[in-house]
Amino acid sequence: MFKKVDRKASRQKKQMSIRNKISGTPERPRLSVFRSNTNIFAQLIDDVNGVTLVSASTIDKALKGSIANGGNIEAAKAVGKAIAERAKEKGIDAIVFDRSGYKYTGRVAALADAAREAGLSF
């Protein structure tokens, strides 16, 4: 018989493998991405102190009015730009990118590219 592939468990296994290799510091925090079917979330995390420094998502009041659908590439670009602007306000220029087990394509890549264009280096 065929084994059913558990996509969520597979992604979480990849996520833990990635998480063991990268870590965020106060000078260079980790940009963690989470995507659902309807929204996308990004946050800059300092793993040394265990705190979130900056966050942005499609459910933020500032972005929700300008985005019709939170689950598409345009919304991911808006979140990437917003997180980069908020990071710049806090004096953060360099980050470590954590794709959280998702393939680097589509919404995840769009968010990363928009953050790079807005001035974050990784």
From Swiss-Prot:
Q: Indicate, by first and last residue, each region the UniProt record lists as having compositional bias (Basic residues).
A: 1-16
**GO terms, biological process:** translation
| Classification via CDD domains | Ribosomal_L18_L5e (cd00432)
The record's region (Disordered) falls at: 1-29
Task: Give all cystine bridges in this chain.
Answer: none
Which InterPro entries does UniProt cross-reference here?
A: Ribosomal_uL18_bac-type (IPR004389), Ribosomal_uL18_bac/euk (IPR005484)
MF term (GO), any: 5S rRNA binding
The record's keywords, sorted A to Z, are: Ribonucleoprotein, Ribosomal protein, RNA-binding, rRNA-binding
Domain of life assignment: Bacteria
Q: Name one GO cellular component term.
A: cytosolic large ribosomal subunit
NCBIfam families per the UniProt record, alphabetical: L18_bact
Among HAMAP family, the record links this protein to:
Ribosomal_uL18_B
Record-stated family: Belongs to the universal ribosomal protein uL18 family.
What binding partners and quaternary form does the record give?
Part of the 50S ribosomal subunit; part of the 5S rRNA/L5/L18/L25 subcomplex. Contacts the 5S and 23S rRNAs.
Functional summary from the UniProt entry: This is one of the proteins that bind and probably mediate the attachment of the 5S RNA into the large ribosomal subunit, where it forms part of the central protuberance.
Q: What is this protein called?
A: Large ribosomal subunit protein uL18
Q: Which organism is it from?
A: Fusobacterium nucleatum subsp. nucleatum (strain ATCC 25586 / DSM 15643 / BCRC 10681 / CIP 101130 / JCM 8532 / KCTC 2640 / LMG 13131 / VPI 4355)
* Taxonomic path: Bacteria, Fusobacteriati, Fusobacteriota, Fusobacteriia, Fusobacteriales
Gene this protein is translated from: rplR
